[in-house]
Every structure is written in C-alpha cells, then in structure tokens.
C-alpha cells in the first residue's frame, strides 16, 4: 500500500461516501449481512439483468406477470464499488497524478461504509457504482469508452486528474517535449500561440468527455494533482460523492 493510499484511508474516516439512490436496490451479494442470521433473509425484488444467478429468479412472478425479477437478499442490498485506476505512463508525469489517484482509492475505500470496494480492469458486477480515475490523455472515443463502463452500471463517476502545468501551462521558453506513452520527442517553443492552441485543444477534448458523461448520466469531476487533500475532499463533496460523518 502506498503512502497516498494510507493517507486516503485515514482521511476517509471523517467522511461518508454517498450511495446514489438508484444503486441501493441492485447489489449482487458483495457484502456481509449487517447481523448474523440475515444472510438468507428476503429483502426485495429487482429486474433481472444478464449475469444474475438464475437460481434467484422468481418463477411465480414470471408465471403471473411475464416479468423477470430476482429476489434480493438482505446482504445483497449494499452495492459494489468498482474502481478503475488509469495505469498508463502519463499518470506518472508528474508523480502527483499517480499519488492523487492512490489517495482517492484509499479515501473511497475508507468512506464507503457497507460497500465492498474492488479494483478492476474491466466492469464485472451488474448495478455496481463505477469510479474511473484517469488523466484522460487518450485519443479513444469518449462515448465508446463510457458506453463500455456504463453498461449495466448503477452509476458512473469519471474523475479526471491533471497537473497544474497540463491544465494551465505557462508561456515562455522552449524545450524538448517527450510523449510519456510512446517516447516520441519534439522540440517545442512555449510561446503564446502554441499555448493558446494547446488550451483550445484541451477545452475541446474536455467538452467531448463532459458531453459523453452527460449522455450516460455519469458524473464528471476535475481535480488538480497538486491540490491539497482538503480541496480534493471539498470537490468530491460538491459533486455529491462525500459528506461529513455525523
């Protein structure tokens, strides 16, 4: 466990992760029942989704109404949080981006009472809460990427982390630009024209991701890697993800 993850775990004890209402009735047996003896207690019904255990299908309801529903047990009510961390090389430039990603994982893990937080490379659990943490420095189509993540999800949160120099580069000087993913090098003058063109491209790129997020009812949160921890928690609270413990 990294130092940033440990700090996130510590800070998460003072806040609570807010579970979206639409995620409260679609868990998949990921957490233990709140008290002994409740593990098989019936709680509610929900619509069948591909991947559900057919043994939980209520055949009586199907016969009466032609509706496919599954029985939800008491221990299945709390949702799974699937956490997706960008592992690409660009997240290490600067290291603060990776550290913020690690901090968020620890923070959510600690703050999400009654949930099981699991790190994934691909979505697996139907009706899970899915959190994507990335700098989004990719040419991939945002709608295609979010369609894959949002499929059968209860809700999706996209958290973009940029360094201060990526979000607002300073003009002046020149240097060698190195692509952290490919190793490609290019001499670049950071004059007003170049920086203006970069900011225009970044704005358009951001708009594409925000529009895709709206289409799939996903939340989009922007963070600066160098921000103090208090500011990070404040941004997540403003996005409806966290609240202080009472």
Where are these regions (language model features)?
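A short acidic (Asp/Glu
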Residues: 142-144
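An amphipathic, basic-hydrophobic helix/alpha-beta surface used to engage anionic
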Residues: 1-121, 129-134, 139-140, 164-167
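Von Willebrand factor type A / integrin I
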Residues: 1-34, 126, 146-246
């Amino acid at each position: 466990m990294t130092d940033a993850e440990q700090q996130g775990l510590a800070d998460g004890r003072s806040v609570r992760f807010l579970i979206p209402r639409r995620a409260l009735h679609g868990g998949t047996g990921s957490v233990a029942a709140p008290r002994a003896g409740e593990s098989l207690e019936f709680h509610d019904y929900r619509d069948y989704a591909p991947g559900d255990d057919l043994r939980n299908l209520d055949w009586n309801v199907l016969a009466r109404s032609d509706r496919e529903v599954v029985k939800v047990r008491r221990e299945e009510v709390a949702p799974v949080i699937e956490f997706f961390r960008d592992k690409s090389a660009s997240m290490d430039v600067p290291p603060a981006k990776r550290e913020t990603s690690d901090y968020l994982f620890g923070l959510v893990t600690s703050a999400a009472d009654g949930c099981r937080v699991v790190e994934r490379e691909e979505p697996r659990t139907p009706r899970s809460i899915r959190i994507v943490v990335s700098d989004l420095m990719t040419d991939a189509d945002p709608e295609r990427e979010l369609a894959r993540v949002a499929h059968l999800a209860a809700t999706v949160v996209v958290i973009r982390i940029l360094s201060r120099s990526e979000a607002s580069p300073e003009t002046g000087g020149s240097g060698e630009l190195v692509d952290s993913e490919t190793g490609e090098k290019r001499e670049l003058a950071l004059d007003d024209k170049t920086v203006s063109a970069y900011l225009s491209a970044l704005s358009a790129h951001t708009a594409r991701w925000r529009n895709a997020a709206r289409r799939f009812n996903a939340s989009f949160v922007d963070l600066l890697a160098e921000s103090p921890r208090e500011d990070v928690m404040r941004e997540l609270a403003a996005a409806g993800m966290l609240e202080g413990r009472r």
